[in-house]
């Protein structure tokens, strides 16, 4: 495999010395970029874009041509796994993702297959291999999956949800069915992420977007327990290097200590958690990724720089910080504001690594 020219991101995740704080943006390949919109129009629809390795590679690389980012992230979607289980994923205009056959009971769970990542999800592995080839060792490639709980919310609700009443009804009225689904998803995600690593992903991230809607006790039982199982089953060495694992529960700042016990290398933080406080609590165990409010990118450049400086100061001197937004970049952010953000992180962080 090609030697990495910039391994800052991987080093920071392992709390090793770096020259400046590495930075990337969740959803950095996305609708705020006019070139992304053009490629998506060429593909026809979102899933066609995901399933075409050359086009998925193109949109993965687009933000790297604009900004000096320290990592690329595979262009895909967390719902590829439930789609491969046969739930019939489609996208409703203005509604987001929907499934034609939601999971309603234990009998539905029992019928679900565990997808073969090189078969039903082979298009994702083709994209990983294509992106790795085209990156030519410039920066590392991040692979990812949704967490079992987050995937289950879409599968049981039949799509996006605001109140999560359908899955919570299953959780409280038929916990056995939900545990069976989460267990099957944990196995599927472990296979899926390991296949991404074998195909060339140099780090992986588990997105638990909806873990924050749970009580503390339910989070431990229905979300964290299954992410822990995945972390235990992942390939942690490949191609002569450690493969770092980041867990990110949006709205999960109160559970960082428990998350840090899973054996992951890093935790993602959303913008509601104070990074200085997070470092005091778990910084001796894991690296931290985050955590600027994505809406800050609407602010004037001077205000963006001020916020970057504040977060860098909050984390302080030393290793173990990957700068990011606290969630995905919004689709109507001016692309030049993202550029201000990335440049500010590199320039203003140098003093913390001397």
From Swiss-Prot:
Gene3D superfamilies: 3.20.20.210. Its EC number is 4.1.1.37. CDD domains: URO-D. It is found in: Cytoplasm. It catalyses: uroporphyrinogen III + 4 H(+) = coproporphyrinogen III + 4 CO2. GO terms for cellular component: cytosol. Pathway: Porphyrin-containing compound metabolism; protoporphyrin-IX biosynthesis; coproporphyrinogen-III from 5-aminolevulinate: step 4/4. Substrate binds at residues 27-31, 77, 154, 209, 327. GO terms for molecular function: uroporphyrinogen decarboxylase activity. Transmembrane segments: none annotated. Pfam families: URO-D. It comes from the Bacteria. SUPFAM superfamilies: UROD/MetE-like. InterPro entries: UROD/MetE-like_sf (IPR038071), Uroporphyrinogen_deCO2ase_HemE (IPR006361), Uroporphyrinogen_deCOase (IPR000257). One of its GO terms (biological process) is protoporphyrinogen IX biosynthetic process from glutamate. The record marks 77 as: Transition state stabilizer. Keywords: Cytoplasm, Decarboxylase, Lyase, Porphyrin biosynthesis. Homodimer. Belongs to the uroporphyrinogen decarboxylase family. Catalyzes the decarboxylation of four acetate groups of uroporphyrinogen-III to yield coproporphyrinogen-III. This is Uroporphyrinogen decarboxylase. It comes from Escherichia coli O81 (strain ED1a).
